[in-house]
A protein has these predicted regions:
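Tandem CBS (Bateman) regulatory domains
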Residues: 1-19, 62-91, 101-109, 119-153, ...
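Hydrophobic, helix-prone linear segments
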Residues: 1-61, 65
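The conserved cystathionine-beta-synthase
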Residues: 22-45, 52, 92-111, 117-118, ...
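Conserved glycine-centered beta-strand/turn positions repeated across beta-sheet architectures
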Residues: 56-59, 114, 122-124, 180-184, ...
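Basic side chains
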Residues: 174-175, 188
């Protein structure tokens, strides 16, 4: 059976709700949201859920919202509230939701993140990393070389933080590669830099002019040979920050999410 036609609770009966959402109150300030978000970007949780007065989910704050806020700033933004920058689009699913329905919902929202009710009366997060967990246990003959080739977005050694952040928003990507290398900068790296000195929020224009190459770039894993998609999913699931380079093309968890829709991704056994 195709994994895309299976209900999430049947694929992951034990771990589907294993990543409780990290929430932040709607009246919390931007600096609090940044400090809370940094440890969770690219994990099972990945984003913050903005909670209302009765702890009901109102919206989401991820790397995209922080970057958009800084790019649009006209001065001191340190006192902007969480509900002033959050995305109001929040996808709620259940255990009966099929994998195909989940990924198609993410394709519509442009965000690989949903919330699902859990057994303790709250919500758990379902992100792209959960799909990596699903795909590593699938059976397939589909190879990495068969993934659709996409344009690799790059930046130059003298690019500023603002230029790279604009590239991210324009191209709807969370990672940008340093041209001619396997080094990259991500929304997480940029937000980590802000968290080291929250005074940047009082002068975002100055932050946008900083050379991004000094932010501490990370290395995409270079894949030396062609693998099956389930093998790559297993490798990426084990990576702290999953990002792979294969024959000059980058592969992110989102590419694995799209591959999960293939008729060749089957239930194991």
């Amino acid at each position: 059976m195709k994994i895309s036609d299976m209900a999430l609770r049947d694929i992951l009966p034990l771990s589907l709700t294993g990543a409780p959402c990290v929430s932040i109150q709607r009246q919390a300030m931007l600096e609090e949201a940044i400090c809370l978000l940094v440890p969770y970007l690219e994990t099972m949780t990945d984003s913050l859920v903005v909670a209302g007065d009765k702890n009901e989910p109102l919206g989401i704050i991820g790397g995209k919202e922080i970057i958009q806020c800084i790019l649009a700033s006209q001065g001191d933004i340190s006192k902007i509230r969480a509900d002033g920058i959050m995305s109001h689009t929040i996808t709620k699913i259940t255990g009966a939701t099929k994998l195909r329905e989940l990924v198609e919902a993410w394709m519509k929202t442009g965000r690989a993140f949903s919330i699902i009710p859990n057994s303790i009366g709250g919500y758990s997060a379902v992100s792209a990393r959960k799909v990596l967990e699903i795909c590593k246990g699938a059976m397939t003959d589909m190879a990495v070389s068969e993934l659709p080739k996409k344009e690799t977005i790059t930046f130059k050694p003298n690019s500023t933080a603002g230029e790279v952040m604009n590239l991210m928003i324009k191209n709807r990507t969370r990672r940008v590669l340093l041209e001619g290398t396997n080094q990259y900068v991500s929304d997480r790296i940029i937000i980590e830099r802000i968290a080291t000195d929250l005074a940047y929020l009082q002068n975002p224009a100055g932050f946008l002019q900083l050379p991004v190459i000094g932010f501490g770039l990370e290395y995409a894993k270079v894949l030396p040979k062609d693998l099956k998609i389930n093998e790559l999913a297993s490798i990426m699931f084990g990576m702290l920050h999953p990002y792979v380079l294969f024959r000059g093309h980058v592969i992110s968890p989102w590419d694995i999410c799209l591959a999960a829709l293939s008729e060749r991704m089957l239930e194991y056994g």
